[in-house]
Amino acid sequence: MKIREVNENKKQFIALLLLADEQENMIDHYLEKGTMYVLEDGNVKAECVVTDEGNGILEIKNIAVDPENQGKGYGKALIDFLASKYADEYSVLQVGTGDSP
C-alpha cells in the first residue's frame, strides 16, 4: 500500500471524487487550491483532497474509497496518513461537508 501526492492531471481521478461530491464544479474548485493524495494497493483504492483553511485548520474537502474496497481500512489509512503528515503544521483536521441536495 502506497500513498502519494498528485500534482498533475488531478482530473484523471475525478470519477472516484464524484462518489463523495456530485458537484463537479466544486471538485474543480478545490482541486485547484488543494492538495490531493491517492492510496494505491495495486491500483487506486482511495483518494482525498485537503485544503489549508487558515488559522491552523486543514480541511478534508473530499475523501472517497472505491466501492468494491470499502470496509478494508483504506479510508482510515488516508486519515491516519493526513493526521501524521500534518500534525506539526495544523492544530485542527476537519471534514467539510458538501451543500449538494
What do the PLM-derived regions correspond to, one by one?
Residues 38, 43-52, 56-64:
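Conserved beta-strand in the GNAT
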Residues 86-98:
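Conserved GNAT acetyl-CoA-binding A-motif
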